[in-house]
């Protein structure tokens, strides 16, 4: 069981590093740069489902929600604003950010946006739960 969990987490980390590395090194900007970082705590225990997807959101879209597992995001195009307990940040093309599991936050799409998203979800966990 621990070996399977370690393999899943290593795979997820490899995907995140690959996506971020590709964006940093493969973009129009030939200068390598840090695109985002943070402290990831509270990894899911046991096996996780690793889900990679592309999300397209229209300008003006808003949502206050939580995720069932850590969620890693790279902005492909457009601009989004994320507001949570730590403040408000604006992200644009090439930027990377993550959302810890269970942390309430709000996304506001400033211009039509396309995000590459990787989620680590414990079995049965909801990707996203809307909050009022």
Residue ranges and their predicted role:
Residues 6-19:
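Hydrophobic membrane-insertion alpha-helices, especially the h-region
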Residues 29-64, 113, 118-121:
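A short glycine-rich, His/Asp/Glu-containing loop-to-beta-strand
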Residues 16-33:
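C-terminal region of N-terminal signal peptides and the immediate post-cleavage residues
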Residues 50-67, 88-92, 98-102:
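Conserved short histidine dyad/triad with adjacent acidic residue
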Residues 101-126:
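Ligand-binding loop in jelly-roll beta-barrel domains
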Residues 30-35, 91-92, 96-97, 121, ...:
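All-alpha RGS (Regulator of G-protein Signaling) helical domain and cognate RGS-like helical scaffolds
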Residues 1-4:
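Positively charged n-region of N-terminal signal peptides that target proteins for export
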Residues 68-85:
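Glycine- and acidic-residue-biased ligand/ion/polar-headgroup-sensing regions
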């Amino acid at each position: 069981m621990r070996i399977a969990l370690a393999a899943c987490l290593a795979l997820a980390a490899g995907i995140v590093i690959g996506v971020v590395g590709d964006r940093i090194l493969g973009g129009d900007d030939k200068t390598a740069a840090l695109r985002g970082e943070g402290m990831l705590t509270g990894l899911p225990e046991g096996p996780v489902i690793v889900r990679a997807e592309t999300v397209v959101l229209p300008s003006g879209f808003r949502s206050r929600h939580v995720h069932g597992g850590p969620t890693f995001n790279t902005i492909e195009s457009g601009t989004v604003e994320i507001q949570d307990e730590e403040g408000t940040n604006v992200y644009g093309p090439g930027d990377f950010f993550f959302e810890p599991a269970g942390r309430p936050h709000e996304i506001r799409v400033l211009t039509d946006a396309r995000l590459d998203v990787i989620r680590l979800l414990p079995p049965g966990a909801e990707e996203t739960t809307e909050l009022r």
